[in-house]
Amino acid sequence: MFDGYDSCSEDTSSSSSSEESEEEVAPLPSNLPIIKNNGQVYTYPDGKSGMATCEMCGMVGVRDAFYSKTKRFCSVSCSRSYSSNSKKASILARLQGKPPTKKAKVLQKQPLVAKLAAYAQYQATLQNQAKTKAAVSMEGFSWGNYINSNSFIAAPVTCFKHAPMGTCWGDISENVRVEVPNTDCSLPTKVFWIAGIVKLAGYNALLRYEGFENDSGLDFWCNICGSDIHPVGWCAASGKPLVPPRTIQHKYTNWKAFLVKRLTGAKTLPPDFSQKVSESMQYPFKPCMRVEVVDKRHLCRTRVAVVESVIGGRLRLVYEESEDRTDDFWCHMHSPLIHHIGWSRSIGHRFKRSDITKKQDGHFDTPPHLFAKVKEVDQSGEWFKEGMKLEAIDPLNLSTICVATIRKVLADGFLMIGIDGSEAADGSDWFCYHATSPSIFPVGFCEINMIELTPPRGYTKLPFKWFDYLRETGSIAAPVKLFNKDVPNHGFRVGMKLEAVDLMEPRLICVATVTRIIHRLLRIHFDGWEEEYDQWVDCESPDLYPVGWCQLTGYQLQPPASQSSRENQSASSKQKKKAKSQQYKGHKKMTTLQLKEELLDGEDYNFLQGASDQESNGSANFYIKQEP
């Protein structure tokens, strides 16, 4: 147990030969703080120096781990408490006929019997907590166990720019050293030790205490953004004791020499890491703010809703007319489904007026600048027109990309899209997409990228051919150049694990896997469920999160469905899905499209095969190329 370097000028030549043979620390990224043995960080325990007893609280520990040069106290607090009572202690010692010594307990804040009783109670509490945790881990879901047992990999935090620390994760990687609580210890107080990152999985890190080398027996998972994870040097600055794990406490005779060698030149967290975590979890949206959000029962319109709660940037919105406040809708604050008050009127979008004539007390309109900005577009030249055909993700069945039609052109680049063959007569299931939305595609996108295209319901001329369909319906394809072709260097790869919102039940966040990558489009599979529940999602969707996000924010994570739960829940889930979809979508059939330099609306198209099922790097023109 120790607080900090007393002095690095101390002679460390007494280190054992086993310590001298320790392997060198592997090189690490350059922009993390370097731990220096300059005498300003730590004091290390020296097994040769024997044991000591704190003169304030009576705790026994390694002498060199004690506070101050005289090694009379186990911590700063004991030293300060003793100082205020030193005169009283001195008088008491003289009356007893014994001068105070470094190993003698001079003053107790409470009787020894009471301390022993408290310590026994503390040990019993620890045992009960251990049993409780074991029971929970057996019955609950553990990302660490799930990843270890299956050798999974997780998407890095840098893939999620909207998530906490997504833009300032830096070079946190394997071999970075941190200070963490030492759970392999029988002391009644909370103590710490240094550990290195063995593996990263999102926010979660597999840690190994220094001194265990290749022994993984006490490896443990924790959230790197948690309150108990600190950069090396934090204990010294905070007056917290560092104690080697009990399992290896006799492994080295000179812990100072060992740690100096292991830590010199190694990397640790930035000193302001916890501050950055805290700042990245501050959200501008607050309860009682009013917004316009899509009406989940009539997708073609918006309604006024009030922010009920904010969790990790996700908003629970309650529709303003809901008397019992149970008619709600979940989405992220950067979702394209929410807008400032007055947005619908400004672009010509349908809007359901509220029966409430005036704002309720405490409710106020959300400032417009808090909402996600859309890319500005020029509608003065060639632009989308009503009746043009395209391909679009069905908002009511996100596992499918369907034949679709532009039903209405709104202001500021917004479009109302209808799914061919399954539209409601009143257009209540039209959906608003921006022209730059990554959820709409030019004609032929699915064929080029070998994605199943869902033809219009009731269309019998199969296999579906766009050329024939356009001719039969007297329609034209939306010009390719009007679609968004940007492909960010997102970093996702097939097989990566993450936490994803079930957009058909947006209050649920589930264990999920990336199963396909088509440029910026990701196929998300919910672990334990059939493929029919998969969803197509953009790589920059605010509904995707790193492993450990739910734990970090306190949101409930839905674990993979077991075989029994799938059988029990499948029927009800499908019923919910069909009810929510409003319209029957027809059987899904694999269609092979045959577009081979045919004329679509009198224009020649050459097809460019886009890279798929791999990590995208940089932008690429992957759509059909329209020749001038």
UniProtKB/Swiss-Prot annotation:
Residues 562-573 have a biased composition (Low complexity). It is found in: Nucleus; Chromosome. PROSITE patterns: MBT, ZF_FCS. GO terms for cellular component: NuA4 histone acetyltransferase complex; nucleosome; nucleus; site of double-strand break. GO terms for biological process: double-strand break repair via homologous recombination; embryonic skeletal system development; negative regulation of DNA-templated transcription; positive regulation of DNA-templated transcription; positive regulation of double-strand break repair via homologous recombination; regulation of apoptotic process; regulation of cell cycle; regulation of double-strand break repair. Keywords: Acetylation, Chromatin regulator, Chromosomal rearrangement, Chromosome, Metal-binding, Nucleus, Repeat, Transcription, Transcription regulation, Zinc, Zinc-finger. Its main location: nucleus. It comes from the Eukaryota. A zinc finger (FCS-type) spans 45-80. Zn(2+) binds at residues 54, 57, 74, 78. Residues 1-31, 560-590, 606-628 are annotated as: Disordered. InterPro entries: Mbt (IPR004092), PcG_chromatin_remod_factors (IPR050548), Znf_FCS (IPR012313), Znf_FCS_sf (IPR038603). Residues 609-620 have a biased composition (Polar residues). Pfam families: MBT (PF02820), zf-FCS_1 (PF21319). The modification N6-acetyllysine is found at residue 115. MBT repeats lie at residues 141-245, 253-350, 351-456, 464-560. Monomer. Component of the NuA4 histone acetyltransferase complex. Interacts with EPC1; interaction is direct and promotes recruitment of MBTD1 into the NuA4 histone acetyltransferase complex. It is linked to A chromosomal aberration involving MBTD1 is a cause of acute poorly differentiated myeloid leukemia. Translocation (10;17)(p15;q21) with ZMYND11. This is MBT domain-containing protein 1. It comes from Homo sapiens (Human).
